Each structure stands twice: as structure tokens, then as C-alpha cells.
Amino acid sequence: MRLARPLENLIDQLLKLPGIGPKTAQRLALYILKLPEMEARQLAQAIVDCRQKVFPCSRCGYLTDFDPCLICSDESRDKSLICIGEESSDVIAIERTGFRGQYFVLNKDFNLMEDKGLEDLNLKPLEDRLATGEIKEVVLALNPDMDGEVMSRFLATVAGSFGVKVTRLAHGLPVGGDIEFADEITLRRALEGRKEL
């Protein structure tokens, strides 16, 4: 069935978003069409505003609308502890845990298995912060996939060259998960990271 061209275009644009399949894109497009015109314009303007006014903090890379960001500007944070994540969404997730250190966000799509991404990383702000001697520990909070492993080793070498302690998030079984369904790597990491009770 043929759809109106503007509707097809909206669906095609929504399909470019992560996690949005054809049915969800169509459902969202039809929902947007039902919005009062003012709300539809506000949605469109919010997207334009984000593209124009949100940028990576020059100090940590977290997405912000002023520089330095609120996290870097917060004097109550532990400046001796820095957590390195892949994306701003990682910072948002870690912030929910009550983490009180600071951050560095890579903000790069890297596929190290295909030699893509390492040369594009801007690590100068991180190296400048490490060089001050104020940072005592770097926590690597990278995804537990092959690229995350390679990047973790690379960043551990970079941070280690400044004499700081380098740790990484523990890997293991999710809360509510069944051991029988866990893969060998997850189980091995859970065993290696076990703690005394």
C-alpha cells in the first residue's frame, strides 16, 4: 500500500533512529500526525535546538549546552576519580548509581576489530587531566565486547603511563539472571570477580 510521500519520508527518517523498526517508525509517524500542530512544531524545534545547542564538554566530552558542563563544574565531586565511558548515555546510567567522581566520554563510534576509530579519538583533554597528578584512579566503564576489551587495554596503557591506578567495572551475572543461560565468558568473569561475604 502506498503512503503519502511526506509520511513515507517521516517513517524513513524515524527508521534511522537506533532501536526503531518499521512498525514502530510507522506507529510514531502516525502518532506525530495526530499531534496538534503546535505540539508537532515544538517536537521539531526541540530536535533542531538539540542539534544546534548541545555539544560535547571540552573537558570531559559529556553532552551539554554550556562549557564546562555541570558535572565538571561541580566542586563537590571527587576530582581524584575519573570514569571513562563510550557515550553520554553511559554517564547518565552511571550517575543514577550515585557515582561522585568525574568523567571522560570517548564519543566515538569505534570498531577496533576493523581498525576503525582509534586514530579519531581525542585523548588530549584526558591526558592533560592525568598530567596534573590530581587523578589517582581511572575507572574504565566500556562495553564488555571485543572492541571494549581492546579499548580498555589501550586506555589502561595510556592512563598507566601517568602512574594512576586503573580499574574496570566488574563483569558478571545480571541480577535475576539464570546461571544456566549465561555464556562461558560471563561465567568466567563472574568467577574471577567473586567477592567474600
UniProtKB/Swiss-Prot annotation:
A zinc finger (C4-type) spans 57-72. GO terms for biological process: DNA recombination; DNA repair. Residues 80-174 form the Toprim domain. GO terms for molecular function: DNA binding; zinc ion binding. Pfam families: RecR_C (PF21175), RecR_HhH (PF21176), RecR_ZnF (PF02132), Toprim_4 (PF13662). InterPro entries: DNA_Rcmb_RecR, Hlx-hairpin-Hlx_DNA-bd_motif, Rcmb_RecR, Rcmb_RecR_Znf, TOPRIM_dom, TOPRIM_RecR. SMART domains: HhH1 (SM00278). Belongs to the RecR family. May play a role in DNA repair. It seems to be involved in an RecBC-independent recombinational process of DNA repair. It may act with RecF and RecO. This is Recombination protein RecR.
